[in-house]
Amino acid sequence: MVLNFKFFTCENSLEDNSTTMLKNSIESSFINKTLTNSIILTTFNDFSNWARLSSLWPLLYGTSCCFIEFASLIGSRFDFDRYGLVPRSSPRQADLIITAGTVTMKMAPSLVRLYEQMPEPKYVIAMGACTITGGMFSTDSYTTVRGVDKLIPVDIYLPGCPPKPEAIIDAIIKLRKKIAQEIYEEKKILKKGTRFFTLNHQFNFFSNLDNPKLTSSNQFFQSKKTSKVLLETSLTFKEKENL
């Protein structure tokens, strides 16, 4: 039982018909209305996560047929604008990169450089089987990167050949849930120069030896071991052709 404020006087007494003034009020009190319009009770982590999860700006990195499925999201049928996605052409304005398609050895340095130019915090969605494992090119192709997670850290894996637009939307929703549960202090910032490739790709990290002035620019080079194997294979193939 509550008393409505209009039934009180300055002398802290009730009016003559006060016996009928008591009722169950279904409305919130005047104090609660004032507080809810001026005060937000939350934590810094929740506020920062809330501000980021609904305004993801993706950098579209399409290298194969999977990107055609992502292009379907731009149309009115799926309309990815309702999720706050704003495609950007510059990595310095994006906080999400979607790798769609096969990643080759020559494209690996460019992908890593694009990821480094993105501001923190940043996220990665690996879209398609070719991006995640190399796909059908991983068995007999020495120029295919067998998993983009060997180059850059991946947050969401989206399998499929190719994935449907509905699956892409589901991956974005899962990424938003992951962002909502993050803790700001535990978010690890990627150190400059860190790489995620493994020795399975026979990558070595060297400075540019052609021009001593460009010591700060780094490139990927194929190791001598891999080059030797490829040379022996090509020579053996040519000898068989001559026979």
Swiss-Prot record:
HAMAP family: NDH1_NuoB. It is found in: Plastid, Chloroplast thylakoid membrane. NDH shuttles electrons from NAD(P)H:plastoquinone, via FMN and iron-sulfur (Fe-S) centers, to quinones in the photosynthetic chain and possibly in a chloroplast respiratory chain. The immediate electron acceptor for the enzyme in this species is believed to be plastoquinone. Couples the redox reaction to proton translocation, and thus conserves the redox energy in a proton gradient. Belongs to the complex I 20 kDa subunit family. Keywords: 4Fe-4S, Chloroplast, Iron, Iron-sulfur, Membrane, Metal-binding, NAD, NADP, Plastid, Plastoquinone, Quinone, Thylakoid, Translocase, Transport. This is NAD(P)H-quinone oxidoreductase subunit K, chloroplastic. GO terms for molecular function: 4 iron, 4 sulfur cluster binding; iron ion binding; NADH dehydrogenase (ubiquinone) activity; quinone binding. Its main location: plastid. Binds 1 [4Fe-4S] cluster. It comes from Marchantia polymorpha. NDH is composed of at least 16 different subunits, 5 of which are encoded in the nucleus. Pfam families: Oxidored_q6 (PF01058). It catalyses: a plastoquinone + NADH + (n+1) H(+)(in) = a plastoquinol + NAD(+) + n H(+)(out); a plastoquinone + NADPH + (n+1) H(+)(in) = a plastoquinol + NADP(+) + n H(+)(out).
